[in-house]
């Protein structure tokens, strides 16, 4: 979908509602960097306990504790106010010197809203992204989007879309009485990308991208409908009217 993946140094915003697969995608992004490219990574979280993250990752076959022992991975559990007070520098500098990370995932930027005024959130996020870029790190930033409808969701309301290079939207959707997961690339700065809305599954090995929702429209609005059947009914109604 990304024609080769995220570009080095990119800031990627992953937006989605609870249970849409954001954390799994973030962990898989870090693990792939470590295993496939030898790029150490940091997972910084404001909401989950370490044991839960280690356990969830192990379910996919990702041994984060072993990666930490090999100095390839760090898990940082902290609070948003500590990150804001240090502007990211004091909190991360020591780890950066020890690990020389190339990737970081932050779960999630949404928690900063509780500690800063709405008008200041964009400024603080910009400061954090700029700091990570100066360290030569690619960042994946999670955002709890709540109710998403089309391309309009709460990320744009606080003005974060302009400061990131890529936006990935995830959403669970109900189609024919079954819940499916949808993924779309809304923005990719400086590179071509797949613009189709695609299904994905969370498998025992992580996230697997499936085929596009080619027979449906309105998936991201929450009101999906089968395109083929609608066109057939229109043609059928048209033919019936002509016979009259």
PLM features: what roles do these ranges have?
Residues 9, 37-40, 71-73, 136-137, ...:
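Short glycine-/polar-rich loops that comprise or flank the Walker A/P-loop
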Residues 3, 16-18, 25, 141, ...:
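Scaffold/interface architecture of coatomer-like assemblies
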Residues 1-64:
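Walker A/P-loop NTP-binding active-site region of P-loop NTPases
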Residues 37-123:
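Conserved inter-motif catalytic segment of the P-loop NTP-binding fold
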Residues 84-167, 175-179:
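P-loop NTPase motor core
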Residues 97-100, 166, 171-242:
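Conserved P-loop NTPase
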Residues 47-51, 59, 79-84, 110-112, ...:
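Conserved nucleotide-binding/hydrolysis micro-motifs of P-loop NTPases
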Residues 12, 42-44, 74-76, 140, ...:
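Hydrophobic/aromatic beta-strand patches that form the interior of the parallel beta-sheet core
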């Amino acid at each position: 979908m990304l024609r080769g993946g995220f570009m080095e140094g990119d800031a990627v915003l992953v937006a989605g509602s609870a249970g849409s697969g954001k954390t799994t995608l973030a962990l898989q992004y870090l693990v792939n960097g470590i295993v496939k490219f030898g790029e150490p990574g940091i997972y910084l979280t404001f909401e989950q306990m370490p044991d839960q993250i280690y356990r969830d990752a192990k379910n996919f076959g990702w041994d984060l504790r072993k990666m930490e022992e090999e100095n390839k991975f760090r898990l940082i559990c902290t609070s948003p106010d500590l990150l804001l007070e240090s502007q990211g520098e004091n909190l991360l500098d020591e780890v950066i010197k020890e690990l020389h990370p190339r990737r970081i995932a932050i779960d999630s930027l949404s928690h900063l809203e509780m500690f800063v005024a709405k008008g200041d959130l964009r400024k603080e996020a910009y400061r954090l992204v700029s700091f990570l870029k100066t360290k030569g790190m690619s960042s994946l930033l999670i955002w709890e989007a709540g109710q998403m409808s089309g391309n309009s969701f709460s990320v744009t309301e606080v003005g974060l879309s302009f400061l990131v290079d890529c936006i990935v939207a995830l959403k669970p959707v109900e189609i024919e009485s079954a819940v499916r997961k949808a993924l779309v690339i809304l923005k990719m700065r400086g590179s071509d990308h797949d613009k189709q809305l695609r299904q994905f599954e969370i498998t025992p090995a992580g996230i697997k991208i499936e085929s596009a929702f080619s027979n449906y429209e309105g998936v991201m609005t929450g009101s999906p409908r089968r395109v083929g059947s609608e066109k057939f009914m229109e043609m059928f109604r048209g033919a019936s009217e002509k016979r009259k």
